[in-house]
């Protein structure tokens, strides 16, 4: 069976992930890679429906554990219906968020506990972990200011969280970065998109070079 490559992109709100992923997808295609771009929560029909529950339900308070379980359920659907088949075909999967988001947002920032959330997601993803995770590190104040200025962005539940919550998100990502420096690479996302894109491609090309026979 052919084995593809699995790259995930992580970061707090306003880190610029979507913009950079667009550029990365185009660049990798010019380098001859079959790129399957996807996102979490979402990526397949049922997971997109769960996404709407998680991010776009207004006026309904959601229990933190319910939230964590819904993210894991969406991830399972996405994994088995889109990511695994693409990897089996030898594609390069480029995913906007994956398990690290749950560990950070629900595990650390919500206070459930990273290991508790890891256990939930271990059942969902089995052994499917990214070959490379790019963490776009943006200061929460800068990220939230970008979100407020983005006229195209649609509202989601995370936009109403406090600055303290978003600082805990950043703190959680840095804990993961310290624990898994081989897989997770930090990129300073406080800079221009051109600079962030340059460093992003450097990390990806370094990984691609290391995987060649």
UniProtKB/Swiss-Prot annotation:
InterPro entries attached to this UniProt entry: P-loop_NTPase (IPR027417), Thymidylate_kin-like_dom (IPR039430), Thymidylate_kin_CS (IPR018095), Thymidylate_kinase (IPR018094)
Reported EC number(s) for this entry are: 2.7.4.9
Q: What class of enzyme is it?
A: transferase
SUPFAM superfamilies this protein is in?
P-loop containing nucleoside triphosphate hydrolases (SSF52540)
Q: Which GO terms describe its cellular component?
A: cytosol
The keyword RNA-binding is annotated on this UniProt entry: no
Listed binding positions for ATP are 11-18
What Pfam family does this protein match (any one)?
Thymidylate_kin
- UniProt entry tagged with the keyword Membrane: no
Its Gene Ontology molecular function terms? Answer: ATP binding; dTMP kinase activity
A Gene Ontology BP annotation from the UniProt entry: dUDP biosynthetic process
What keywords tag this UniProt record? ATP-binding, Kinase, Nucleotide biosynthesis, Nucleotide-binding, Transferase
Q: Which domain of life is it from?
A: Bacteria
Q: Tell me what reaction this enzyme catalyses.
A: dTMP + ATP = dTDP + ADP
Explain the purpose of this protein.
Phosphorylation of dTMP to form dTDP in both de novo and salvage pathways of dTTP synthesis.
The family assignment reads: Belongs to the thymidylate kinase family.
What HAMAP family does the database record attribute to this sequence?
Thymidylate_kinase
- Which named protein is this? Thymidylate kinase
Q: What is the lineage of its organism?
A: Bacteria, Bacillati, Bacillota, Bacilli, Bacillales
Gene this chain is encoded by:
tmk
